[in-house]
Each structure stands twice: as structure tokens, then as C-alpha cells.
């Protein structure tokens, strides 16, 4: 009996596994271990004093509020942009699709400088919003704008492949059975999109938690008002207070990991429920 040799795209299992583990150790575990080593230099009382400092707590609140608003905005308009790019054909569609990746390619400092110019009192958007007594620069709203700009591609690029795979024929079939467009979207499209949409919003939120370059230009560094956690960490590093910087960072890291774990659990349960039906 002839032995059938299986062809693999990657080299041998041992080499592939070893390379993967090396990558995980160097890129993921090593930075985390450095963070833990810095935290080990602090007692629990010192750690608690740092993370519960009133100014640090205020930075947590501003960061979480702005990231939440930005992620909700991205969830709505990211879904809308993915829908337009997938369901419609129009002149300039390819250019618009390419522009969706601009926040990834644009340096965050350049993005922050551009947003600060547009939303300043004399800027194009700033002058318009001033008529409604809305100020964006040097407020938490400016932080949310910067976060939304830098993280909206996560939603668009997560939802877009699912929409392309789903196709419009499912909506058309629902409409031929008497469903309205809203009903077909809510009962046919949205259940299929929900896992990808939730994942995109979660990625947008976690990305926003660590935003620094764009935020500093549009919101500045006003104590108790526009300070974000990434800026607090930077200030502690400038003071060579590495344990305190690590303590502040550990709270955001824990929040991000908890969110990602919750989203993965929710997605798996949602997937099992859909398959069960």
C-alpha cells in the first residue's frame, strides 16, 4: 500500500510552532512581563494610591467617556460606510474605499494637527459649530473626535467582508415574502452582522483607550479636563517614575482584556444560538 504524503504550505510542525511561540514571546509576553516587573517594585498600598489618585481617576473617566462615545459613533457610521461601499456602485467608490484606510496610514500627530485646525475657533468646522455654541478643541468632545477618526476603520473593515459574503439576495428574498426593507435588515441582515459589528466596535474602543498623538493636539493637556490615561503615563515616564506609569497602564490593560474576553464570550454564545435556530 502506497503511503500518501500530505503536503503542507508551512514547513514542519516543530519549526512552525517554534516560530509562532518565539513571536508570541517577543511581541506579547516580553512587554507584559516588563510591566509586571515594574509593578512588583510597588506594594499594594503604593499601587492603590497611584491608581486611585483623584487626577488619575479623572483621566480614567475622560478616557472611558470619550472612547465610549467614539466607539458608538464608529459603530453607527462605520456600518453605514460599509453598507454603502458594499451595496452601491457609484463614481469614486474605489477612492472612498481607499480613504477608509487613511487613518491607519496617517501618523497620529498629523491627524491631530489636521483635526485641531479644522475644529479650532477659526477652523472650517469650528466656525460652523460655534453658531450652536459647541466647542470641540480642548474639550472631551475633541478627544472623542480624535479617537473616532483614528479607529473607525476597525468597524468598516470588520463589517465589510461579512456584508460582501452575505449578498443582497437574502434581503430580496425576505422582501418577496412580504418583509419591508427595515424588517429584512433587522431580521435577516443584522443577526448575521452582529458578531462582526460587536467585534469592530470593541476593537475601536480598545484602540481609542490608548490614543495619544491625535488627542494631545486637539485637546491639549488641561488637568482634570482633557487629560487622558496615555498622557498620564507619558508624564510619569518623563518623571522616570516607571512603577507609577506601569500601575496606570495596568488598569487600562485590564479593562481592555476584560472587554475583549467578554466580547469573545458573547460572540461564541451568539454563534451557538444562531446555529441552534
Curated annotation (Swiss-Prot):
Q: Name one GO molecular function term.
A: ABC-type sulfate transporter activity
Major location category of this protein = membrane
**Annotated signal peptide:** none
Q: Which residues form a coiled coil?
A: none
CC per GO annotation: plasma membrane
Q: Where in the cell is it found?
A: Cell inner membrane
What keyword terms does UniProt attach to this protein?
Cell inner membrane, Cell membrane, Membrane, Sulfate transport, Transmembrane, Transmembrane helix, Transport
Domain ABC transmembrane type-1 residue range list = 60-263
Question: Per its UniProt entry, which superkingdom is the organism in?
Answer: Bacteria
The record's section on NCBIfam families has: 3a0106s02, permease_CysT, PRK10971.1
Report the sequence similarity comment from the record: Belongs to the binding-protein-dependent transport system permease family. CysTW subfamily.
Q: How does it assemble?
A: The complex is composed of two ATP-binding proteins (CysA), two transmembrane proteins (CysT and CysW) and a solute-binding protein (CysP).
Query: What is the designated name of this protein?
Result: Sulfate transport system permease protein CysT
Amino acid at each position: 500500500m502506497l503511503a500518501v504524503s500530505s503536503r503542507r504550505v508551512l514547513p514542519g510542525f516543530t519549526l512552525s510552532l517554534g516560530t509562532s511561540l518565539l513571536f508570541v514571546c517577543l511581541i506579547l509576553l516580553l512587554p507584559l512581563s516588563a510591566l509586571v516587573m515594574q509593578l512588583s517594585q510597588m506594594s499594594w498600598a503604593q499601587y492603590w494610591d497611584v491608581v486611585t489618585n483623584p487626577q488619575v481617576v479623572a483621566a480614567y473617566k475622560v478616557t472611558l467617556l470619550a472612547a465610549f462615545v467614539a466607539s458608538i459613533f464608529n459603530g453607527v457610521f462605520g456600518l453605514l460606510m460599509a453598507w454603502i461601499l458594499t451595496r452601491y456602485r457609484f463614481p469614486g467608490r474605489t477612492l472612498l474605499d481607499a480613504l477608509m484606510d487613511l487613518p491607519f496610514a496617517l501618523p497620529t500627530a498629523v491627524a491631530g494637527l489636521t483635526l485641531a485646525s479644522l475644529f479650532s475657533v477659526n477652523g472650517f468646522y469650528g466656525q460652523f459649530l460655534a453658531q450652536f455654541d459647541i466647542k470641540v478643541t480642548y474639550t472631551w468632545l475633541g478627544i472623542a473626535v480624535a479617537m473616532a477618526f483614528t479607529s473607525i476603520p476597525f468597524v468598516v473593515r470588520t463589517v465589510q467582508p461579512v456584508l460582501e459574503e452575505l449578498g443582497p439576495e437574502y434581503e430580496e428574498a425576505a422582501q418577496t415574502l412580504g418583509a419591508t426593507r427595515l424588517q429584512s435588515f433587522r431580521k435577516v441582515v443584522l443577526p448575521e452582522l452582529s458578531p462582526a459589528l460587536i467585534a469592530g466596535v470593541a476593537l475601536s474602543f480598545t484602540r481609542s483607550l490608548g490614543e495619544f498623538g491625535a488627542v494631545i493636539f486637539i485637546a491639549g493637556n488641561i488637568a482634570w479636563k482633557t487629560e487622558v490615561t496615555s498622557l498620564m503615563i507619558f508624564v510619569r515616564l518623563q518623571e522616570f517614575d516607571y512603577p507609577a506609569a506601569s500601575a496606570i497602564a495596568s488598569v487600562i490593560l485590564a479593562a481592555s482584556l476584560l472587554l475583549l474576553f467578554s466580547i469573545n464570550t458573547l460572540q461564541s454564545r451568539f454563534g451557538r444560538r444562531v446555529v441552534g435556530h
